[in-house]
Amino acid sequence: MIELNEKKIISKGRLGPGEILGVRIEKGKVFNNKDIKNYLAKEYKHFNNQIIDLDKKLPIKNEKNIFSGDSLRKLQHCFGYSLEDLELILHPMAEDAKEATGSMGDDTPLAVLSNKYRPLYHFFRQNFSQVTNPPIDSLRENKVMSLKTRFGNLGNILDFNNLTEENIYVLNSPILTNNQFEKFVSFFDKNNKTIDCTFNSDENIESKLNSIKQEAEIYVRQGVTQIILSDKNVSKENYPVPMLLCIGAVHTHLTKMKLRGYVSINVQTGEALDTHSFATLIGVGATTVNPYLALDSLYQRFEKKLFGKFLYEECVERYVKSVNLGLLKIMSKMGISVISSYRGGSVSYTHLTLPTTVQV
């Protein structure tokens, strides 16, 4: 301990999460957190005029379902939805705006050993950080965590002479509702292309994945900035390729071709339901996710008046909020503070063993 004269102390305080302190010894100056960040940010002042907040253009309102009745039930069966999933996972997320809680432990069989159908994301288990990269408290340190999702190429942010002059589009969350997704596609009308992620009996998954990769590469080289991977075309003749494989294949292929930074990979899938499924999709490279089947299943329960006084838009908002909170929790376990650092990082590991290796 060093004794100091209290009269010589100009200010007292402590560093909070994400804050820094600078000292310039030769000039005898101390710079607080705000001074340092203002100094660094002034180099990018012109970015303010280029940043466009998409949340203002894509509000959650006028939500509507896509499928209903027999079509919806067939899709739920196709993607492995059970009554337990709808009642114990989906319903609490919309009702309480947070993940459902249950007893400690998971005594279900590993997906690879199960004799029942299990979605591919069940084969993935979440990792957690070790001492070298401590976890973050997503509740108390939420100021340093963000789900902001950016569209557009920033170029090399370390090269002040070669910064992009294009607009930068930002969303506060990577989760898009059905109405938001429809407006999103319309907004990027000339710069988006949809790739069908279903295959028929004349194809196999490996050949379809190769086709999807090549199609994505061609679109990017043509100047497309928004690729949409969709399994909505599923039918009696068309079977969905697991979206995890599609995203992983496209993300890895474009990265190898040094094209990934020029495009966003947007996903429209019936697979996404709980926070783990969203986390795995983003973890293998998805930029945004539209869980159309989960939202339609939500509407099905809303029509049965199972949410009491809540309007459908409120149910959707609460569901999206619960997914966002779940993503922050999963990221915090790995000590990751922003979604862009989690995206494509593959911080989960898998128990899956395939007889034929498919490069994703």
Predicted regions and their residues:
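Alpha/beta enzyme core
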Residues: K213-I227, A279-T280, V284-T287
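Phosphate/diphosphate-binding loops
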Residues: I2-N33, K256-Y292, D296, Q300-R343
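Conserved small/polar residues in nucleotide/adenosyl-binding loops
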Residues: Y349-T356
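Extended, highly charged accessory segments
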Residues: F31-I36, L40-T198, N204-I212, E217, ...
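Glycine-rich, proline-tolerant flexible connector loops at the mouths of alpha/beta enzymes
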Residues: L229-L244
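Alpha-helix-loop-beta-strand connector modules within alpha/beta enzyme cores
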Residues: P242-G261
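A glycine-rich phosphate-binding loop feature that marks nucleotide/adenosyl-phosphate handling sites
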Residues: R140-S146, S230-N233, Q268-T275, I336-Y349
